[in-house]
Each structure stands twice: as structure tokens, then as C-alpha cells.
Amino acid sequence: MKRICLLALITTMSGCAMLEPIETDEVTQATTVVDAVEGDKSKDESSGIVDTLRGRNDPVAGDPAWAPIHPKQKPEHYAAATGSLFSPEHITDLYDDSKPRGIGDIITVTLDETTSATKSANADLSKTNEAQMDPLQVGGEELKVGGKYNFSYDLNNTNTFAGDSSAKQSNSISGYITVEVIEVLANGNLVIRGEKWMTLNTGDEYIRLSGTIRPDDINFDNTIASNRVSNARIQYSGTGLSQDMQEPGFLARFFNVAL
């Protein structure tokens, strides 16, 4: 009986030891924990042949790769009582802007992207060849073969080509998105990342942005223009029925490729 009780005690203590949390850094913790989002379909199974025929995988809200950063709470340090109300631990510079400097700080990016490209080409080619020879004469008379054909020819050849091509493309996006600082580089630059989801009737629309910024480019109101973001990745699209109706079906894509 004593052996059974001892074995049960050892098993219980081993299980409790396995429940201890594993310490991870802030970035790793943020990218492995998915926030609870209403309507999150990240764990839903694929609909099989439907997704295959659609030819794409729609992004979902709560993707671990876009999870927000949750910095750990720093331990409090109690200073010795000096009788003064001033605390150097909570000092704030009167002339310093409260710009984001650490992991988890937020910043608003002003989306103002406009791109336009135009290309045109014209080509005109023309070539003309002419060759003539008067009839041969011998003794003042034309030399003929069989009394019918003389030795003369007249050749004309003209080649022309005209080509015209043009291409034009333009894109524009404007709006706002608030993102978080996920990493502080050695030179002081900040790596930012964030997304915004909007549910509209039968579908969702999302904006995703990531890149690197300089703290000096941040405005006094904690905003920065999107054209100041280095290595910017901006995604604006949607999911659902409205998005599906904008794309050709499986058979249409098949015949377009086959033909």
C-alpha cells in the first residue's frame, strides 16, 4: 500500500513540473499566440475541392504571423525613501516628443500611395527596290528570242511595316492603419507590422502593412507617411462572396490557359 501511495505522489509531482511555463522572448511569444478573434477561421479545415478549384487560400484574422506584440510587465523597483516627490525612474523630458521607441509601441501609418506607369512605342519601316534594263539592241534593232521576246526586265518591290503599342497602369490607395513595433534594430530603426480587418456583410476586407521606419521620420502626432516606410509590404484585399465574384471560375481559367 505504501508503494502505491509513493508511486502516485511521484506521478503527481512530475505532472505539476510539466505545467511550468516555458520562458520565451517577446517576439517569439507574440508570433506563437493567436488572439481570440470573432469569426477566426485559422483552425477551420479546408473545404477540399472548393478551395482547390478556387486556386487560392484566403488569409484569416488572427494569423500568428501577424499577431500583436504583448511585452512582459517589467518588475517594479522600490527606491529608498528620500523625502522627495521627484523620482528619476519616471522622468519625462519637457521638450521631447513621446515617439515610439520600444517593442509593443504603436504608430499610425498614413497610407498615401499613388503609382502610375505609361509606356508607348511606334515603329514605321519602309523599303523600296527598283531594277530596270532596256532591251538589248544589235545593229540598231532589238535582239529577240524566237522573234517575240527581247532581253529586258523591269522589277519593283516595296515593303512597308507599321507598328504601334501602348501600356498604362495606375494604382492608388489612401487611408490609415495603426501598427506595432515588433523589433528595434541596432541602428535605432524600428520594424513595424500590423493588420486591420473589417467585416462588411458577406465578406471581410483587410489591410496589412509591414516594413522598417526611422524614428526621426515620425511626426509629432505619432503618424508617419507610408512613403517613409522602407521595404514596405502593403496588402489591401478582401475575402468572401464579393471577392469571389471578381475572379473567373475554374473552367474559365482552364480554357484561357488551354487556348
From Swiss-Prot:
Residues 1-15 form the signal peptide. Residues 38-63 are annotated as: Disordered. InterPro entries: Flag_Lring. The keyword Lipoprotein applies. It comes from the Bacteria. GO terms for molecular function: cytoskeletal motor activity. Its main location: membrane. One of its GO terms (cellular component) is cell outer membrane. It is a lipid-anchor. It is found in: Cell outer membrane; Bacterial flagellum basal body. Keywords: Bacterial flagellum, Cell outer membrane, Lipoprotein, Membrane, Palmitate, Signal. One of its GO terms (biological process) is bacterial-type flagellum-dependent cell motility. A lipid is attached at residue 16 (S-diacylglycerol cysteine). A lipid is attached at residue 16 (N-palmitoyl cysteine). Assembles around the rod to form the L-ring and probably protects the motor/basal body from shearing forces during rotation. Belongs to the FlgH family. The basal body constitutes a major portion of the flagellar organelle and consists of four rings (L,P,S, and M) mounted on a central rod. This is Flagellar L-ring protein 1.
